[in-house]
């Protein structure tokens, strides 16, 4: 039907949003439910939440959306859910969770995971990847559970991604899109199937029968069950479509489909993603993720603590702005962003390495602020954090360009940080590339809607769907002089400092761990 809508749930770290999109990319209706407590911590650096917490919020926001306009809600021809990554669920034989989710930001480690085979350890050492593999091995939730909750692990019938579990709650089928399975699990990202004998299979030694069914992106997972219909208000039998992860959907939603484009996501974590038909590892042993289009990939570099760092800064250094924002009815970030123009490019020599949490491929990195003098203010720190995040993303983008032979000529921004004109302009100046925003900040949900309408047959290809559903709202042109300055800082200082200080960070970590 020509007036059909796509119902999309965007399940985030902080909230769930429900949206109805038309085939022109317009949001016809939307509703949001913000979590009062996104997660709880039983120990420092732990983060957990009930799996059904997210389904319950889907139910709340779905009913809220239906109440806005039952007529529009009834026009939904499909439903799709896109979810944050690297969060898994232990399901019992009855389909119920056996424990709460260990969320993606959780930093616990297995102390004595199952030893890796000697021949594999030798190969990892030969490739110079011992520390990265050890970090992957120890930080995998499955290995922590197997070590610390062995009886529960034995009882686990299925070990699935959160997205898979939500599919199950809606349809009764334990299946997921090949573009949603981004977690520490034995997945062959290149071939979109479970890895049975690959080199890194031993790192996540999960029995094959504990894993879910894999579907091509755009497939029908199943019809909404009568029970899910009762709880959500979604008509029973409405087809649920397999789409992709939040970052993968966001990249498509930002219209990044060509090999001269890159998507920058300025969310809780920051990423730079390409879309490419050729598979290549963005860094050694780190896979390119399957893209929402089934014949494409999304190589990515991620800064785990991305725009979360602005929250960290706000909590520790910007109480005055927080109080002022309450009085003005705006966010503290809006007030802080107005001061960005008061600080020159390069933050008067203050430089940030934004690795408050080390990445999987860089286990010895740590965060740092260098270059302090007595005239620096908190506003210098704020701008330096934004610049530091961009330097790290630039470093990741340049590395992927070298490994792929691609040349990026245009950037597309999504995530909360992209709402700021000042941040967008700084980004254009630093990368020396035009930076564009699309018609909506809901690029993740839009990407899931694009996948939905391709699956429903409204469009013959993703390129066709993007042409009809995505519009450029504004573009920021780089300032050539500022780019020259940033390029010098990156090449002459940032890269050299990063390489020089990483061994010291490793030593410092070893010393302080021993002291504990």
Where are the predicted features?
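Short glycine-aspartate micro-motif
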Residues: 4-10, 73-81, 159, 239-253, ...
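ATP-dependent carbohydrate kinase catalytic cores
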Residues: 189-294, 327-338, 410, 418-428
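Glycine/Thr-rich phosphate-binding loops that ligate phosphate moieties of nucleotide
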Residues: 1-34, 77-118, 151, 218-221, ...
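Phosphate/pyrophosphate-binding loops at sites that engage ATP/ADP/AMP, CoA/4′-phosphopantetheine
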Residues: 58-77, 148-153, 196-208, 230-232, ...
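N-terminal phosphate-binding loop and adjacent alpha-helix
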Residues: 32-74
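A polyampholytic, Gly/Pro-enriched intrinsically disordered region
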Residues: 52-54, 118-133, 233-234, 260-263, ...
């Amino acid at each position: 039907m020509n007036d059909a809508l796509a119902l999309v749930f965007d399940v985030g770290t902080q909230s769930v949003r429900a949206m109805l999109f038309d085939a022109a990319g317009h949001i016809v209706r939307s509703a949001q439910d913000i979590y009062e407590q996104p997660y709880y911590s039983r120990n420092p650096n732990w983060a957990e939440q009930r799996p059904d917490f997210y389904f319950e919020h889907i139910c709340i926001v779905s009913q809220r959306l239906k109440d806005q306009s039952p007529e529009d809600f009834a026009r939904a021809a499909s439903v799709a859910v896109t979810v944050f990554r690297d969060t898994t669920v232990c399901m019992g034989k009855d389909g119920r969770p056996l424990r709460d989710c260990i969320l993606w930001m959780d930093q616990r480690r297995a102390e004595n995971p199952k030893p890796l085979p000697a021949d594999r350890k030798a190969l990892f050492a030969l490739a110079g990847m011992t520390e990265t593999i050890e970090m992957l091995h120890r930080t995998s939730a499955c290995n922590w559970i197997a070590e610390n909750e062995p009886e529960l692990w034995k009882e686990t019938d299925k070990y699935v991604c959160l997205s898979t579990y939500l599919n199950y709650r809606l349809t009764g089928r334990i299946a997921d899109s090949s573009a949603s399975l981004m977690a520490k699990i034995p997945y062959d990202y290149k071939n979109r199937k479970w890895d049975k004998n690959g080199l890194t299979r031993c790192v996540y030694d999960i029995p094959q029968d504990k894993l879910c069914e894999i579907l091509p992106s755009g497939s029908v997972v199943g019809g909404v069950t009568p029970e899910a219909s009762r709880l959500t208000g979604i008509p029973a039998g409405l087809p649920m479509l397999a789409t992709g992860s939040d970052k993968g959907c966001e990249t498509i939603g930002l219209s990044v489909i060509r090999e001269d484009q890159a998507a920058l996501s300025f969310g809780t974590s920051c990423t730079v993603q390409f879309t490419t038909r050729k598979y290549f590892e963005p860094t050694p042993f780190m896979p390119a993720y399957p893209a929402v289009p089934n014949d494409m990939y999304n190589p990515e570099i991620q800064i785990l603590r991305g725009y979360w760092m602005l929250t960290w800064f706000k909590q520790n250094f910007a109480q005055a702005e927080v109080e002022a924002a309450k009085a003005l009815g705006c966010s503290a970030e809006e007030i802080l962003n107005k001061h960005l123009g008061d600080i020159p490019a390069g933050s008067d020599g203050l430089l940030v390495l934004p690795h408050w949490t080390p990445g999987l491929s860089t286990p010895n990195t740590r965060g740092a602020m260098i270059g302090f003098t007595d005239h620096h203010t908190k506003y210098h720190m704020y701008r330096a954090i934004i610049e530091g995040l961009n330097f790290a993303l630039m470093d990741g983008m340049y590395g992927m360009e070298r490994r792929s032979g691609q040349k990026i000529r245009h950037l597309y921004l999504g995530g909360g940080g992209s709402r700021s004109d000042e941040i967008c302009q700084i980004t254009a100046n630093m990368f020396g590339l035009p930076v564009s925003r699309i018609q909506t900040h809901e690029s993740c949900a839009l990407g899931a809607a694009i996948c939905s309408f391709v699956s429903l047959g409204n469009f013959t290809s993703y390129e066709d769907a993007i042409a009809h559903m995505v519009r450029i709202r504004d573009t920021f042109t780089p300032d050539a002089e500022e780019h020259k300055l940033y390029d010098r800082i990156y090449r002459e200082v940032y890269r050299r400092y990063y390489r020089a200080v990483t061994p010291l960070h490793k030593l410092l970590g070893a010393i302080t761990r021993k002291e504990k």
